[in-house]
């Protein structure tokens, strides 16, 4: 027995344990290996930094730790997903309706000799509707796939390890902690490594940290934070160039990447706002249905009906309240919007996300590639003692500078020659900016800049043959090459050098001005310093350039230059200029950020890049708007230390990841509340997640954009995750709800607009659909209370809900926005509901009642024309429905057989049905707008006009088509009977136009409080 009890507790324990694990994962990467010496690391992992592990030891560790692979998360089986579509949300209501119908039919079959099949048909139709719409939604969602499969592709297949002193290739899954691993340019890193030796090694950490530049790797600890230090490389990042050797310090799920994967797959994801809305709506409708059903159940018992009859009535009323067509309408509306968004480059993976974007109140955007173009571009040059601006626009429509200066010719020569980047082959017809380059980001920026301004770099390099080169390294921070010159009369070699500006300047004694060498004096050094600070302050990456003609007597033609043991001068060179690069903002972004601001959406930048660069881009795209200052700006302006500035004075703030690490939840909340414009720089993946959770604590609906693996936890946690289609890693695409096919932030704004529009239009669609519920229910209620012949049958109700109302309801999804949707605040999910009490009151209490009157008017007209005046109908029901009574007298004394009476009754059903169609014309037109007059909005919605014609044609077809009297018990009507409901239709239109006029004249008045849904 004891065991059983423990089992009971374990799910709870597991839940708690899972939550603790997730909290651990949210903490920063705890790693100490980067601070240890190589010997300490080897001691800790019982390995040798020359020989590596022994084979037996490696096997032992592999058995202990398991393979070096990521654990796939539990996936939801397809059948469960299918069942969710069949039994989730709205479908439940229809299922209950169907079961009740079968129940009622069962009761009737058991108690009557000749039961009517209406309830059976209704049950079957309801079940069919749910199954068909369920399949449709399942198909839509099945197009999106699972999160982890992309992680699988990230595991490198082979790794080069050293065991017992021998190099060997092993499967990456067999790499264990303590293994000695070698990596070279082009390899994927097989595990987290502590570097013990490196030669020109650079890794691309962009998918992990968001840094666009390749990062140098060396054995020294350069930073306390393991993500920033140079002596650790991470599992599944790429080695771009050079070689390195390191000791494995973590494998599989314990690696930094593994933690992110676990974090992303373990996050609790809340319901989408629209799912919450639909749930709220179902509760409302069910409430109304049950209330009506129970009231009339009690009433019918008081009126003397038997228990069985009362139960049949109860079921009938509940079923009549179910809007059968609405599930399909909502699904189709969302699908249409998703298709429309796909045409505008937003691919929506899950249908409900379509609307989420519309209710978004905060967007946390990644910088690289989303707000920027994701290509380093030369932005400024400094030569001849002035700063020149380069063209950073995507289509080269920007500024140009004076290219005739001799200094620029020299500068472009250095930038083209002292550069290892080359265009990949076969791209001659492609525009320069679009070409692929082999080389790092800065060098390819220089290459493209020189190619655009000075013509072919390839030709330049062929004419000035390279004879020697020292590649860039982190100790001397420059790159140098020596070339023969193209001038046939000049036999001197040309030495060209580029690198960190202050290091380059230290090696120079002269400076080139207007093509003449001048001595480098203090004044020029100060000018250099100012230019360097100005460009650096713009968040740009600055490089210095210098050259030197080697004297011919010392370095004759054919001189053997030795780059290891340098046998030529590298001092007293001639400084030529600076060039600075930035990843420039995309053209459409500032406008998009402005639109977000006027739509009441807060845009927060979250990036792994440097604070200065982040701030510069934030100002460039308007995330920090003109005139808004950060604490640092205020301190600089007033010339006081930052600590003396009151943080409340600053509207904008730039927060560094290392500071964020020590913040409590309360401090984060305070920042989010008190600043309107926020930039988070140098953030880790875990911090991104913490920022998203902070915004959600404020009650915001958060959209997150990202492209790297590091973004996936935040993408998953956000209310809507938006991944990049071009630059995005597979992982981020899997975690997201929506993918921007053109990687452009501006597409998000389009998405917000579409999301807000669909919310408005769904409201209209639902208002339209629900209104016809009243003329469908009231006949049944009067049938019970006044004992009159049934005015409208079950089959006819289905013809309205699944026939005539469908196309018009869907056509409202195509309705254009009434006012500028993007000028209002985001909706508050707590107060602005999809279906609120006011909508129910309008649809049921006002418009619906007028519609019911129209239907009853036709009903009484037809019966009166046939001889049954309204006064004689009350209490006639029992005789009317009695098969044995074949001599029922009307108001004029004529006798009617059972069959004849039924023909008149079914003709009334048809007329009532047609009346509902006629009054629904007016309802459709008034539902086009919620505040504007229809005359302001116009009738531009072609689908809606088609819907009007379609429902009329369908009604006429059902009434006049031969054979319908048998199939659906619909009978042909006299043309004059079509016009009975016209006055009511007109009344609805006039009533609503007057209501909207009052709304517009008295905004916020009682009419708005009572009727504006």
Curated annotation (Swiss-Prot):
It is a multi-pass membrane protein. SMART domains: Cation_ATPase_N (SM00831). Residues 1-77, 143-278, 329-762, 814-833, 929-941, 997-1013 are cytoplasmic. Its main location: membrane. GO terms for biological process: cell communication by electrical coupling involved in cardiac conduction; cellular response to amyloid-beta; cellular response to steroid hormone stimulus; intracellular potassium ion homeostasis; intracellular sodium ion homeostasis; neuron projection maintenance; potassium ion import across plasma membrane; proton transmembrane transport. InterPro entries: ATPase_P-typ_cation-transptr_C (IPR006068), ATPase_P-typ_cation-transptr_N (IPR004014), ATPase_P-typ_cyto_dom_N (IPR023299), ATPase_P-typ_P_site (IPR018303), ATPase_P-typ_TM_dom_sf (IPR023298), ATPase_P-typ_transduc_dom_A_sf (IPR008250), Cation_transp_ATPase_P-type (IPR050510), HAD-like_sf (IPR036412). One of its GO terms (molecular function) is ATP binding. CDD domains: P-type_ATPase_Na-K_like. Changing residue 887 to Y: In DEE99; decreased sodium/potassium-exchanging ATPase activity. It is found in: Cell membrane. Residues 72-74 are annotated as: Interaction with phosphoinositide-3 kinase. Signal peptide: none annotated. Pfam families: Cation_ATPase, Cation_ATPase_C, Cation_ATPase_N, E1-E2_ATPase. It is an enzyme of class 7 (translocase). Changing residue 947 to R: In AHC2; strong decrease in ATPase activity. Mg(2+) binds at residues 707, 711. Changing residue 274 to N: In AHC2; strong decrease in ATPase activity. One of its GO terms (cellular component) is synapse. The sodium/potassium-transporting ATPase is composed of a catalytic alpha subunit, an auxiliary non-catalytic beta subunit and an additional regulatory subunit. Interacts with regulatory subunit FXYD1. It is linked to Dystonia 12: An autosomal dominant dystonia-parkinsonism disorder. Dystonia is defined by the presence of sustained involuntary muscle contractions, often leading to abnormal postures. DYT12 patients develop dystonia and parkinsonism between 15 and 45 years of age. The disease is characterized by an unusually rapid evolution of signs and symptoms. The sudden onset of symptoms over hours to a few weeks, often associated with physical or emotional stress, suggests a trigger initiating a nervous system insult resulting in permanent neurologic disability. This is the catalytic component of the active enzyme, which catalyzes the hydrolysis of ATP coupled with the exchange of sodium and potassium ions across the plasma membrane. This action creates the electrochemical gradient of sodium and potassium ions, providing the energy for active transport of various nutrients. This is Sodium/potassium-transporting ATPase subunit alpha-3.
